[in-house]
Amino acid sequence: MAATPIRVIVSALVILSVLLLSSSLGVATETEIERNETEVRLMYEQWLVENRKNYNGLGEKERRFKIFKDNLKFVDEHNSVPDRTFEVGLTRFADLTNEEFRAIYLRKKMERTKDSVKTERYLYKEGDVLPDEVDWRANGAVVSVKDQGNCGSCWAFSAVGAVEGINQITTGELISLSEQELVDCDRGFVNAGCDGGIMNYAFEFIMKNGGIETDQDYPYNANDLGLCNADKNNNTRVVTIDGYEDVPRDDEKSLKKAVAHQPVSVAIEASSQAFQLYKSGVMTGTCGISLDHGVVVVGYGSTSGEDYWIIRNSWGLNWGDSGYVKLQRNIDDPFGKCGIAMMPSYPTKSSFPSSFDLLSEI
């Protein structure tokens, strides 16, 4: 029996669909990264050495290996997409689930519970001329990247980083200061050592305490016993500040003006898997505004049409771009990327050397 025209057309469409599906599957397969178990195992062993990991629990190494494989899959899938502005990689957190990462290194939502003195010092005004790029590292105002360890003390590292910066700008001396003094001694209504805190309260403590010790005199140990070392705390304070102020909130232009003058403490949402495994480039991934991590902005710039903030983190050198992240700047949201413009603040200190002030005319 001869096939009807309709049957011929239907058969042709079915064959065409199969061919198209096979073609699309072939393309997808070509972009996938296939890794065998031996290769992944070797990568895992190398990662363990590089990150000085040693698991004691029975079966813990294998359990972590499974998590490592899941994170490696995420890394391969992310980096295989063309035109990404940033790359992810096997950071120091590659053996943690995202839930574990958030529980250990991030804390409850950070909220501005203590406002500073109202000021328009860095309020952006029409006509202000700001540098296209600023990097306080190049100006010698940023201490090398530190590591908060398994302690939720990001607030202390953020505040101390801003104080180290303004102290260098006003005195010419770059001194590494003590986060541990804040963790041990700044205990009050909000700040709670390894259980989180707010940068403005840290600035307040430094003021009332008459200054803050050096990291050498009061070294960091990532422990939270709630005991202030009175002997160390009573030493001569090395660095003081005059006060602290908030950058006008929800305004990236004002934040840019502030960062053009000094490093600034900010809070961001850092809970995504992409942030956990961030390696390099301009971070443009999805993130919200549930602020859970304190960092310090040490500059800004642009590359390939993408504006970014330069952020010094406190997760050591085996995360990000040697401890730094470039976070997308000038987005169509008043809160800024990951909420960066929601809670910025900075310490104040007099005697700005005119030769060092980048914007003496503003």
Swiss-Prot record:
Transferase as UniProt keyword: no
Glycosylation sites: N36, N234
Entry annotation: catalytic residues: C154, H293, N313
Annotated disulfide bonds: C151-C194, C185-C228, C287-C338
Ranges annotated as spanning the membrane: none
Keywords noted in UniProt: Disulfide bond, Glycoprotein, Hydrolase, Protease, Signal, Thiol protease, Zymogen
InterPro entries according to UniProt: Papain-like_cys_pep_sf, Pept_asp_AS, Pept_cys_AS, Pept_his_AS, Peptidase_C1A, Peptidase_C1A_C, Peptidase_C1A_papain-like, Prot_inhib_I29
Residues of the propeptide: 29-129
Pfam families according to UniProt: Inhibitor_I29, Peptidase_C1
One MF annotation (Gene Ontology) recorded for this entry: cysteine-type peptidase activity
Cleaved signal peptide residues: 1-28
GO annotation terms (biological process): proteolysis
Enzyme class: hydrolase
Enzyme Commission no: 3.4.22.-
Stated role: Probable thiol protease.
Family listed: Belongs to the peptidase C1 family.
Record-given protein name: Probable cysteine protease RDL2
Organism: Arabidopsis thaliana
